[in-house]
């Protein structure tokens, strides 16, 4: 799960530390602000995902090949992440960009919810796959997250726990399936 440290601090030093304590209440970001331990940070998603949904290898490759053409802000600035929703055929349906990978995913989730999300497809991110990205994808109700970069160990364990198919190092035509390999079918 992670490492949690318990440290004993002298009373006078503790009071000094307490006086300097910053406000942990966060209003934007990945959702970890205000969490003082790992259990608070690792909230279990309540949404159920379709563990029977599978995607074809050709759909993954098609979406990966098309992703860079949909990133208009990245083309102008070279400084943004993108998150995209691709349908079952691998056609990019929606893309959202932001300098923050979490913000890009939040924007995508909001746009999908407004449009009427049906769950038949997959999320692609141009970033690494952290457990927060896994958590948000599961909360959306999507059954697959594909990341251009590596997943973290906690992301892999969380994906296994939630039933999410997690794919990393995805650069067409190659990728690595970390969880639920049976959900990616050959053509």
Language-model segments: which ranges?
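Arginine residue identity/basic-tract feature
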Residues: 13, 21-22, 27, 43, ...
